[in-house]
Amino acid sequence: MSFSEDSDRWQQAVYYFTGYDAPHIDKLFTEWVGNDDIPLMKVELTKQSRVTYVDVDDLQWRVDNAGRGVNNTDFVIPFYKTGNEEESGKDAAGDQVTYYKARFTLLGNHNGKDRPTGGVYEGGENKAKYDNDFKKSDEGTTWDTGPHTQYSYGTGRALEALLDNDGGTRGFEWNGLDVPAERVVDLASFARAAGAFDRVAQFYADRQAVLEEWHKRVGMEENDAWKGTAAGVFWDLIHTLGKRYEDYADDLRKGAMFSVPGDAIRIAGSVFQKEARKLQQHWARWEIKDGNPLSFVSDLLSEIVDHVWDTNITNITYKVHTAARGETRTTYHATGNFRQDAVDKNGKNYGPLNSLDTWKAVGAAAIERWKKSVKENLVDNADLALRAVHDAWSPSVFDVGTIKTSSGDSLSQDYEKDKADKEKKEAEEKAEKYRKEQEAKEEKYRK
């Protein structure tokens, strides 16, 4: 498999976009097993009491499961075998064969009254209900498809909730797995945040106009007589607020209705929503076709049946033996091209047809094929979506502007400065008056 829990961008992206924390990819199939830890299916190998030609009804499941639907979860693969239980069958030409049937029951949901295989369903723990083809001791087998459905179907449904529901993923739950309140994602929050900045910008613009009118009434320049007095403090207040509100309005406003931060947030939210929609669409196409791993099991078993037909079932002959009394007996034998291994269309050999380890490997291979589909259809596209949002929200693109406070002293500092200026001016005026008085006295004495 080309990705794992750490690199599962689909699981990570859905968590990031919706707050829905789906099970990790490595945990989906640990409890979805049959006998002998065979993934996704139960298998029983039975040696038949006599050798005969294959019953075509045993292969009807291939017709039932044509396409992507799994209408029949009860499969039979008939095959012939030479030698003892361990021999592979190579160089078996002429050897007498015995007749076996590998009986399969796929564990999970299928077409019919339960639900369409290619659609969404909630899984969970199940208990086997087998007919007499399987041993009574196997009837207690249980398996759990819950983690798989939480991953395969819950993730897509969480994206749909984000995009379509008022409140986003608030209250969302799939098969017992919910989005807690602290992780809820609501697309409307972008509009609310942007609107808040718009209102703040409008507030400063409106108040700045009011303060400017007040400023005109009290004078655009401070009256020297007011310095160091309550009137001076009031003038400083109007002047400082007017300047700061003017700066805030200039920094925040964008046009008559909007704000710089508000527009940046709206653009970021638009990119977020667009990428979430893409993910939901990729998922919708994938789940109807490849969401159910049982379709991959059916496909792989069909490939193996093709090989069994070509190299096993159609490669036997028979001999008729006549006893002294005229009684006849028929035996069946392998021809030169006879083989008895499970091989897929790519030539991969999973082992002898009569070994449960072989079918365990087949189940594991079907899971890997399903994961490959997840990688190509979900994981890769999720990586692109996360990159797109990251780029749109990077500091170089997500520019909320710069909101600065004009430099200036506090009102108390302005008051102390005005008071000091006033005292200094009074001292200078007093000194100037004293100087002039002294000059006048000197002039009088000279006369």
Region spans (language model):
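Intrinsically disordered, low-complexity Pro/Gly/Thr/Ser/Ala-rich repeat tracts
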Residues: 1-159, 268-447
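Long, charged all-alpha helical bundle/coiled-coil segments in cytosolic proteins
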Residues: 134, 142-143, 180-190, 227-228, ...
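Long, amphipathic alpha-helical coiled-coil/dimerization segments that form elongated scaffolds
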Residues: 196-331
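Short, charge-rich amphipathic alpha-helices with coiled-coil/heptad character
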Residues: 161-193
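Glycine-centered flexibility motif
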Residues: 80, 84, 108, 185-188, ...
